[in-house]
């Protein structure tokens, strides 16, 4: 019951949340959208703006290191909308877009991801994959902060459970 996506203007991200709030056909409780480089729906090197919509107000998430203001809602019973920024350097990830360049996005990204979840790579790609996994873990509310999501993502890579999930998806 979580939607992940991307947005170009913050007003659009808010409109997406409002649309799900009014929808009679989609029972989503949470929307996380990213404004990264070139509209990617993931965290890219540098600064990424994140928009967060929750159907249930005041969930009490801490986000990135408990980093900020209160979610905005018009009344106690209405959904909340908030936005915040993620800077990859704040997570000890000092790399540029060029460091993540690949020639064939689909093929290279797949093989790199396989190597990372198999524990065969520990480089900028591994950091980028772990941070993006952290946001997805946070979006599902398995953790209350992005920092905790990053710890969980790295543990899943280290203990092999990330590779097991990838294997299960392949078998599906």
Positions of the model-derived regions?
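Glycine-rich anion-binding loops and their surrounding alpha/beta cores
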Residues: 1-145, 152-172
């Amino acid at each position: 019951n979580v939607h992940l996506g991307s947005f170009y203007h913050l007003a659009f991200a808010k409109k997406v949340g409002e649309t799900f709030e009014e929808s009679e056909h989609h029972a989503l409780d949470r929307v996380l959208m990213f404004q990264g480089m070139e509209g990617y729906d993931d965290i890219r090197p540098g600064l990424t703006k994140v928009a967060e919509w929750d159907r249930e107000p005041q969930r009490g998430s801490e986000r990135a290191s408990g980093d900020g203001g209160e979610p905005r809602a018009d009344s106690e019973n209405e959904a909340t909308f908030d936005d915040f920024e993620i800077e990859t350097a704040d997570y000890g990830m000092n790399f540029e877009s060029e460091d993540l360049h690949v020639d064939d996005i689909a093929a290279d990204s797949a093989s790199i991801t396989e190597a990372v979840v198999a524990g065969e790579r520990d480089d900028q790609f591994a950091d980028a994959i772990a941070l993006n996994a952290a946001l997805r873990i946070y979006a599902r509310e398995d953790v209350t902060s992005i920092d905790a999501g990053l710890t969980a993502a790295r543990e899943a890579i280290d203990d092999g459970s990330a590779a097991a999930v990838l294997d299960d998806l392949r078998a599906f």
